[in-house]
Amino acid sequence: MIIMRSRLSLATAILMIGIGLAEPAWAEHFFFSTGNPDGLLGALSRRPSPGKIETETADDFALTETTVISQAVITGIIVPNTLPLASISQVEVELYHVFPLDSDTTRTIHVPTRVNSPADVEIDTATRDPLARTLSFSSTLLNPSFTVANSVVNGINASPNQLTHGEGPQSGEEVAITINFTTPIILPAGHYFFRPEVLVNGGDFLYLSAPRPIVPPGTPFPAGVTDLQAWIRNANLNPDWLRIGTDIIGIIPPATTAPTFNMTFSLAGDTVPDAGTPGQANCHGKTISALARQFRGIHSAALALGASSVNDLQDSVARFCNP
């Protein structure tokens, strides 16, 4: 579905209203946003395709309790800017723990550091893909021409050649991609990285940066949790990651420090305070019971959380309970 609008805030408002109408009064809504694009950077986020290697850009978020994530919005530019919105043909989402979880800490790394990076591998049960019918997406045009001051597209290199200072300005159509998780993502409290990828027929999607530290209308991180900078890798660098600002852009005079970036995204859903504990025998039954109580029935829960069916919600719970 292709939609034309002028501002990301409108898309986000509609997203929140749609969820809110389906929620009972006692359900606590979850919403996180890094805010609006700052025009400083566009970083490649690309599904693999013939002649083009996979490139992943990831930024972090935190949860203070078990949460069902139903929707996400990402903002970027399509290059070249002559492409129609229909050229956005595929979106995939992966989530990562923070290193050293899910990582081989005995191998020799080929980057300056892995501290505070995404893990080597994704949380397999949290991957969502339209080919697996676990997400759907729609695209909204925000600005027919948006320019970023710098970009990272091809210059993603192992140490000691990681410093490129970026690849210069890029212009393209600014778009918001709204992602609906038809199999919602359920996660326990924790610190995670969100990694979307986009396939653009005949072009690329450059994920737009947002201010770091977060400023309004973005939402702050929970007390005691550090907002980490964005990281990137391509298939050649995998399983390592590079810091986009510190490692790749670096210090560009007259600046005396390297920039750091957030990426422009938001997440929406609901907390489930009485959910079960992953790995425990009663996790599935306890979580389903908690959802049924919270939403006055499991069918209502599936509707409120954006699941395409009760079976898909059951699948979400099974993935959560058996990571």
Show the residue positions of the predicted features:
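Bacterial N-terminal signal peptides that target proteins for export
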Residues: 2-11
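Boundary/junction segments of secreted and surface-exposed precursor proteins
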Residues: 24-50, 270-291
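Aromatic- and Gly/Pro-enriched, solvent-exposed loop/edge beta-strand patches characteristic
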Residues: 54, 78, 84-226
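Extended extracellular/luminal ectodomain segments enriched in beta-structured repeat modules
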Residues: 64-73, 189
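Soluble extracellular-acting proteins and domains
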Residues: 271-323
